[in-house]
Structure formats: C-alpha cells, structure tokens
From Swiss-Prot:
Signal peptide: none annotated. Its cofactor is Mg(2+); Mn(2+). Keywords: ATP-binding, Cell shape, Cell wall biogenesis/degradation, Cytoplasm, Ligase, Magnesium, Manganese, Metal-binding, Nucleotide-binding, Peptidoglycan synthesis. Residues 104-303 form the ATP-grasp domain. It is an enzyme of class 6 (ligase). This is D-alanine--D-alanine ligase. One of its GO terms (molecular function) is ATP binding. Cell wall formation. It comes from the Bacteria. Disulfide bonds: none annotated. It comes from Haemophilus influenzae (strain ATCC 51907 / DSM 11121 / KW20 / Rd). Pathway: Cell wall biogenesis; peptidoglycan biosynthesis. One of its GO terms (cellular component) is cytosol.
Amino acid sequence: MNLKQEKIAVLLGGTSAEREVSLNSGKAVLEALLKQGYNAHPIDPKEYNVANLKKDGFNRAFNILHGRGGEDGTMQGLLEQIGLPYTGCGVMASALTMDKMRTKMLWKAFGLPVADMKVVTRETFSELDPQAVVAKLGLPLMVKPSLEGSSVGLTKVKAVEELKSAVEYALKFDNTILIEEWLAGDELTVPVLDNQVLPAIRIVPEGEFYDYEAKYISDNTQYFCPAGLTPEREQALSTLVKRAYDAVGCRGWSRIDVMCDAKGNFRLVEVNTNPGMTSHSLFPKSAATVGISFEQLVVKILELSL
C-alpha cells in the first residue's frame, strides 16, 4: 500500500476546549507529511463537513483532534460510516477513555491499580458530605471533571472547607466529577506505539501539579526520559501500561498517564488516545529516545490507520 498516492486529510482544530493545542499538533503533523512527499491537507471540522471527505477525494484521515468531538468516538463513528480509514483508536476505545470515571472502573474490574475516588454528579452534589469524603480519602484531594481533557477544571483541595467550591468549579466543565486521593509520588506518562510500549517520561511541573499552563505554555516544566526508574520498575510499568491499553481496547497509538503514591506504587490515571504532537509534546520526546524521529513517528502512526 503506497500511502503517498493517497489524498490524506489531517483533521485538526475542531470545537473542543483543546482546539488551540490540536491546531498546533495538526500543523506539526501536516508539515512532517508534506516534507516527506505525502499529499496531505489540513481539515478543520469547525469549518468543513467531514462527512464530505470521501466525496472530495480523500482516502484516509490522520486524526489529531483533541477532546470532545474528535477524540470521544463521535468523529471515529462518522469516519467509519463514510468508510474512511483513520489513525488511532476506534469508536469504543475513544468513547470509553474520554470518560475517566468509567475507564477507571473498567481497569479496577481487571484488577489494575487506580486511585481511590468518590464520584459526584450535578444531581448528587447537594448530598456531598465533605467530612465523610475526607475521612475516606484523606487530604489533600484532587478534584477533576470526568470528561474534559488537558487538565481543564482541576483543583488541589488542601482543606475540607475547600471541597465544595472545587467541585462547583469542576461542574462548570462537566456533569460528573471525580474526587480522588492525592497521589504524592512521581508523575509518569507512557506512550504505546503499535503495541510496543515506549520509554516512560517523568514529569516535574513547576507548580503543584501538571495543569493546562504546565502542559502547553510553561517552559519550566521538566521532563525526564529515561524517567530514572530502575530497570525492574520500568519493566513493571511497561507491563502495567500494556495491560491497561489492551483492557480499554486501544489501537495504533495512545499515551497512558500514571501516578505514583507516596510509597511508589503505580496508579493508572487516564488514556490519551490522540496524544499531543507539538514541540512541547511527550510522545515525540519518548519516541526520539529509541531513535524514532518526529517525521518517522508521523508516518508510522499513519501506516497503522485502519
């Protein structure tokens, strides 16, 4: 299959809260494809009806949309309907992993380690008992929307009095909120490419946690790859991540975030099914340590499209 003879749509932008990040990722992917002689075109679903891709002569889509409408199964379903092969996870894995709560419940059912949590919805918010939550999960706590990506709507709660307002803030972004035990250990992210687990990256944010600012704007967030784990721990992490990837049905490529508790035990956090591909992005950083250039990575992801 010679993909250079195909007309490729690079899906970027979109309408989610992560539009800007997707535009940056898409630009980098598009440049890498054009540089290598691919017939690639930028397509922004905000301005173009993706249902017309096949009719307009496109053969394949490189989906680098982030967040709702691009990474949550809806775009995947549309592409399936028009019969256009696309990069990344399918409908089910994309929809499932967009929902952090249900992803964690599934992992838990598979016997995989996740943080202890309490789920609050818009409907149950009035019954929230901060004292009981703190008694069960301790302090500090992490409060986050279940569905929003890129660390939008997160709050670190250090006192019981702060819990309600943190949940109220998160409810601006989603109807389902997770209150989780605070994981005080290392923050790691682990890319998977074509069923191969790539080296983990350790993230050391300037602030208290890895939020939108640290992710996309700050140059003071530090990334370590290799992550400084012992070979045994790196292997254990790799095995855990592969099991987590398979449990939710990922394919092609994804990046899985993992936190350590104060004792160093791994806890699965979430799956990014369309990881960022900007200059700040972590997937390319990890791939580079095993000799895969950005251009090679983009082509590899494209070749894995189904």
